[in-house]
Amino acid sequence: MPRSLKKGPYIAQELLNKVLVAQETRSKKVIKTWSRRSTIFPDMVGLTLAVHNGKKFVPVFVTENMVGHKLGEFSPTRTFYGHAGDKKAKMR
């Protein structure tokens, strides 16, 4: 369920501060964040954010197509190794 329009999109205040500082200084330094729930704003386009997936930080380069999505969508938390195979089929 999407967030109410009267509330507006959510962004962590410390992440917003880091993004604004990076824009002012034209810094290309990677910004680390644990805030997977923050919405991507147009101000973030062109920056690289390191989003935590629970184990490590995944670098995410923000493009125009990502605006409006959440940061957590681009940092997968689960690893899929494939379904278990049929042991009888392998023996043949």
Swiss-Prot record:
GO MF entries: rRNA binding; structural constituent of ribosome
One Pfam match: Ribosomal_S19
Any one cellular-component term (Gene Ontology): small ribosomal subunit
UniProt similarity note: Belongs to the universal ribosomal protein uS19 family.
Keyword Ribosomal protein in record: yes
PANTHER family according to UniProt: RIBOSOMAL PROTEIN S19P FAMILY MEMBER (PTHR11880), SMALL RIBOSOMAL SUBUNIT PROTEIN US19M (PTHR11880:SF8)
Taxonomic superkingdom: Bacteria
PROSITE patterns found in the cross-reference section: RIBOSOMAL_S19
An individual GO BP term: translation
Protein name in the entry: Small ribosomal subunit protein uS19
Species per Swiss-Prot/TrEMBL record: Desulforapulum autotrophicum (strain ATCC 43914 / DSM 3382 / VKM B-1955 / HRM2)
UniProt keyword annotations, A-Z: Ribonucleoprotein, Ribosomal protein, RNA-binding, rRNA-binding
Source taxonomy: Bacteria, Pseudomonadati, Thermodesulfobacteriota, Desulfobacteria, Desulfobacterales
Role played: Protein S19 forms a complex with S13 that binds strongly to the 16S ribosomal RNA.
